[in-house]
C-alpha cells in the first residue's frame, strides 16, 4: 500500500520552537491592544471577541478585559481557537510589513521539494490557525512553500492530543491510516495519531527532548519514503 501522504507538526518539527515563542508570541501580545481597538467592528474579529468572552465565562467583559484575557492565554500557551485566529490576523500584518520571516528548518525546505517531486501529499497540522500556517510557509526562509502543500489543519479539526483529530484528518483526505505518516516532536501527539492507526515518526532535534517508543529522526534528511 505504501505511504501516500505526510502530515507534519510545525513547532519543533518544521519550525524552530524558539521562533514561535520568542518572535511570534511576543509580537502578538504587544500588537493585541491596538489591533482589537482598530478592528473590533470587523465581523471575524467581533466573533473572536464574543468567543473569548464565552470561553472565559465573562459575557460582560469590555474590550480592555478581553485583551487582558487573550494576552494571558498567549502566556499560558492556550490553544483557544479565537486566540489562534486573532494571532493569525496579527501575524499577517507583521509578515506583510517585513517585521519577520517564517523560520523553516533547511532540511524541511529540501524535503518538502523531494516529497512533492515524489507526488506525495503534504499536509500540516498545528494548533496555530490554518491562516497562520499559510503565512509561515509562504513567507519562509526558503521562499513560498505553500504550493507544495495539499492542505493544512488546525484546532477546528480537533485537539492534537486526541485520537479523533487524526481520524478527522483521515476522513478529510480520504486515505487509509497506513497510507499516512505523521511526523511530530511531541510524544502525546504521536500516541494519538498511532491510536487512529496512522504511521508515526518522532522528530528529535534536541538531545534533551523526551522520546518514546517511536521511530526517530533528527532531520527530514533521514526520512526517505520509497
UniProtKB/Swiss-Prot annotation:
It comes from Shewanella sp. (strain W3-18-1). This is Enolase-phosphatase E1. InterPro entries: Enolase-ppase_E1, HAD-like_sf, HAD-SF_hydro_IA, HAD_sf. The gene is mtnC. Pathway: Amino-acid biosynthesis; L-methionine biosynthesis via salvage pathway; L-methionine from S-methyl-5-thio-alpha-D-ribose 1-phosphate: step 3/6; Amino-acid biosynthesis; L-methionine biosynthesis via salvage pathway; L-methionine from S-methyl-5-thio-alpha-D-ribose 1-phosphate: step 4/6. GO terms for biological process: L-methionine salvage from methylthioadenosine. Belongs to the HAD-like hydrolase superfamily. MasA/MtnC family. SUPFAM superfamilies: HAD-like (SSF56784). Monomer. It comes from the Bacteria. The keyword Transmembrane helix does not apply.
Amino acid at each position: 500500500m505504501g505511504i501516500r501522504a505526510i502530515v507534519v507538526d510545525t513547532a519543533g518539527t518544521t519550525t524552530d520552537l524558539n521562533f514561535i515563542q520568542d518572535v511570534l508570541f511576543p509580537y502578538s501580545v504587544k500588537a493585541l491592544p491596538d489591533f482589537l481597538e482598530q478592528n473590533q467592528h470587523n465581523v471575524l474579529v467581533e466573533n473572536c471577541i464574543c468567543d473569548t468572552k464565552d470561553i472565559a465565562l465573562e459575557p460582560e467583559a469590555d474590550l480592555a478585559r478581553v485583551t487582558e484575557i487573550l494576552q494571558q492565554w498567549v502566556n499560558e500557551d492556550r490553544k483557544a481557537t479565537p486566540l489562534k485566529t486573532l494571532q493569525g490576523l496579527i501575524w499577517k500584518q507583521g509578515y506583510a510589513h517585513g517585521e519577520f520571516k517564517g523560520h523553516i528548518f533547511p532540511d524541511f525546505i529540501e524535503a518538502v521539494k523531494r516529497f512533492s517531486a515524489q507526488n506525495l501529499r503534504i499536509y500540516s497540522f498545528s494548533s496555530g490557525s490554518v491562516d497562520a500556517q499559510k503565512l509561515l510557509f509562504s513567507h519562509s526562509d526558503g521562499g513560498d512553500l505553500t504550493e507544495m502543500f495539499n492542505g493544512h489543519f488546525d484546532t477546528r479539526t480537533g485537539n492534537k492530543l486526541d485520537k479523533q483529530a487524526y481520524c478527522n484528518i483521515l476522513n478529510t483526505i480520504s486515505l487509509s491510516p497506513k497510507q499516512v505518516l505523521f511526523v511530530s516532536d511531541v510524544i502525546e501527539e504521536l500516541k494519538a495519531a498511532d491510536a487512529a492507526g496512522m504511521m508515526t515518526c518522532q522528530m528529535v532535534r534536541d538531545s534533551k527532548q523526551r522520546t518514546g517508543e517511536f521511530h526517530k529522526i533528527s532531520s527530514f534528511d533521514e526520512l526517505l519514503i520509497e
